[in-house]
Curated annotation (Swiss-Prot):
Binding positions for [4Fe-4S] cluster 2 per the UniProt entry: 287, 371, 374, 377
Residues that hold [4Fe-4S] cluster 1 according to the record: 277, 280, 283, 381
UniProt source species: Bacillus subtilis (strain 168)
Main EC class the enzyme belongs to: oxidoreductase
GO molecular function: 4 iron, 4 sulfur cluster binding; metal ion binding; oxidoreductase activity
Topology with respect to the bilayer: Multi-pass membrane protein
Residue stretches spanning the membrane: 4-24, 71-91, 109-129, 146-166, 173-193, 199-219
Protein's name according to its UniProt entry: Probable iron-sulfur-binding oxidoreductase FadF
Amino acid sequence: MSGFLIANALLFLIVTAYAVYLFVYLVKTRLAYIKLGQKEQFDQRFKERLHAIWVNVFGQKKLLKDKKSGIIHVMFFYGFILVQFGAIDFIIKGLAPGRNLSLGPVYPAFTFFQEIVTFLILIAVGWAFYRRYIEKLVRLKRGFKAGLVLIFIGGLMLTVLLGNGMNLIWHEHGLSWSEPIASGIAFMLSGVGKTGAAVIFYIAWWIHLLFLLSFLVYVPQSKHAHLIAGPANVFFNRMESAGKLEKIDFTDETKESYGAGKIEDFRQSQLLDLYACVECGRCTNMCPATGTGKMLSPMDLILRLRDHLTEKGAAVTSRSPWVPAAAFRHTRGNQLAAASAGSGSQEAAAALDYNPSLIGDVITEEEIWACTTCRNCEDQCPVMNEHVDKIIDLRRYLVLTEGKMDSDAQRAMTSIERQGNPWGLNRKERENWRDEAPDAEIPTVKEMKKEGKEFEYLFWVGSMGSYDNRSQKIAISFAKLLNHAGVSFAILGNKEKNSGDTPRRLGNEFLFQELAEKNISEFEKNDVKKIVTIDPHAYNLFKNEYPDFGFEGEVYHHTEVLAELVKNGKLRPQHPLHETITFHDSCYLGRYNEVYDPPREILKAIPGVQLVEMERSRETGMCCGAGGGLMWMEEETGNRINVARTEQALAVNPSVISSGCPYCLTMLGDGTKAKEAEDQVKTYDVVELLAQSVLGADLKMGEKQ
């Protein structure tokens, strides 16, 4: 037996060492691929980053947003960590028969706990198999590769239970309460005898070891690389406000292009995202573009970028992405690596001719322009991948480097550049909306200065509030409520320009920066300390992105100011409305800035209002379809996003659909018309409803919206 044990131990060391070598090689290879990206500075905010690890890795916070899948993953995650101690115990039993993990009197409790955890993991494997292959959850991939990890995990659990059962027979330990499942197996197979039990034990032991080491090697070259890249991605995730876009330095004369025209143009942290992807499909499941039949799928976008990085990385670094190399010699990645190293077959040399373009071959322009930048994908991602900034970088390349843009979007850009608004209307008519409210005091900054008066808030009206007839009513209602509450404010009037959100989200960073600098100059010239706006897109820009260009000041959304005025009694809702209202969360107010409660607090304060929530609300609220500059583009593929969102609102039988965004309100109003429901269901901004309750203002509930 001693000779066998020596041979067994030597073989164990050789196989384990080879597996560890392959694992390290694969991790270093992926790291080399990631390093092809653009370097970036690390802010060293370790405390916050460790907190993110605690919450999202160990706390599984994002995974538990989907309770069913989340619970399965929690069982896998903690179960797999815990059973590693059992695996060590099992390996010791094979290397030194009769020995085990030295835990003294607590060993029986340890083995009992291990068996319970092992059993729960087997249940989780069965549940996961059911969800993927029988229930056929749409967002989950099927096929052999998708189920291979279930085979690995299930095999590991079954072999350790079988091996422990045989160990009881082999060493005549007898049945034990501390190993109930192994004891059951031992009881059923008691007829095999000691020798037979020893043989079966080592068969199970080696299968277990090979499963374990194969899984170790499989992880870095599969979607399960997220076990390594996921926690790293959470740790290195940007600590800035959600969805904040990187500033382009146009003064850098070394730059030959802007945006991402090739995979190496992405930042290293963006490339880390690609290997962190779990392929869970949660992003795609929530994407408004995917849900309405567009080509864009956030998960597929990440996976195609990942595969492209792997192949490009193999060609550049000469490091084969797949091991054992002999088994994967026919894959493009290994052929590219071999050809790059000057070795390999004719097929490997021919592989060098494969040079797909990032935009066109890997990701299509149609996909790039389908994104509404709503960030529902990012909010759902358990490893904190950022999809939107990659799409914006691709847009930046198309717009700034190649001069490509959708014709409708280009018209809006030209109009903004020439007249400061997307319609190309006269910039000198920007403040004319005040004429629609002769009973309200809506002074310009210039007028306030002329009278020697000061103002607390700069009311940023925005292009919609200034020029769009429907949105002007929102601006007027807000101004009247500020007058009623005694809040001093002023507008820039004709000095106001477009905030720059549309150009920036469409990829025209140059125009955005030009607008931002001019707006900030106007703020500074007029000593602006506080800004309030009815436009969530401008709100997000001023609050989170203008500071990169030198702006310092407080920024508020109008619902935040109104909620506070209601709370402190300066605005008293008194006229009942008797309406059933559902509230639509603007993406740039909600997911980007986590402003969910103020608009709801306002609606709840209005007498007679019954607030009902849509199935998708707050963090999971669906986009109206206007974000990302798509307000100015036609949807030519699939169903209209605004109609899909309107259908979700109509499903809860409201009499009013409310929002806190003029863009959303326009899209939802068009949606009710498309569903021929505009006579039964009206669309109003929160401020209009509050104005009716506080001032008794007649909103003409039956008028055409």
